[in-house]
Amino acid sequence: ATIDATISLELITEASKRIVPNAAAVLDVGCGAGNYTLKMLSKVPNLSCTLVDLSLPMLDKAFERVSAETNGKVVVKQGDIREIDLEENSFDIILAGAVLHHLRDDQDWETTFTKLFKLLKPGGCLMISDLITQDTDLLNEYTWQRYGEYLEGIGGAAYRQKVLDYIEKEDSPRSMNYQLDLMKKVGFSKVEILHKNMCFGAFGGIK
């Protein structure tokens, strides 16, 4: 139950196309069924695509869907982006949709952002669409209250509780400010905010 998922997907892929109009290779981190890559291919055709996910059934589905839409090479890698071996300076675009909020402590975040930075070619971009927090506790409480009301509106009180309990147990999102600052720290030359609505945002950085 993501707020503004459609517009965030549109914005990060359109921004990627404009930042790297001659892109040849995309990496999709936590690709799921391949929706982000498919949207990217609708804007920049025939990219070579590397799809990473923990779930083999999802990877199989993504491979089938993406292969049908590009003449470029499609590579699938099952596993965690933190552990998978990929060649540095080899991607024009990295897409990370609803995945980085699984990172845990500061070291985990910094190590992962450093790795993603190194995987990009100079001038390439990392684009993120994800669950986020606020830096101010009072505002953070407010945004999660709003999100809870949104969830209840689409699925009732039990659905709201189920989603929020899952997030509490499984996820450790950070604020957009934290992630943009971290991008600068690990070497990104520019960072950009594309969209934000309560506890969801779309943003990125250019190497």
Locations of regions flagged by a protein language model:
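Conserved alpha-helix/loop element of class I SAM-dependent methyltransferases that forms part
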Residues: A5-N22
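Short glycine-centered segments of the SAM/dcSAM-binding site in methyltransferase folds
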Residues: A25, G124-C125
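Class I SAM-dependent methyltransferase SAM/SAH-binding core
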Residues: A25-V29, A33-E83
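A short acidic, Gly/Pro-enriched loop at the edge of an enzyme's catalytic core
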Residues: L86-I94
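A short beta-strand submotif of the Rossmann-like class I SAM-dependent methyltransferase core
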Residues: A96-L100, I128
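A short glycine-rich, Lys/Arg-flanked "PGG" loop and its adjoining helix->strand segment in the class I
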Residues: E110-P122
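C-terminal alpha-helical "lid/dimerization" subdomain adjacent to the S-adenosyl-L-methionine
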Residues: S129-V186
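Core SAM-dependent methyltransferase catalytic element
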Residues: K184-K207
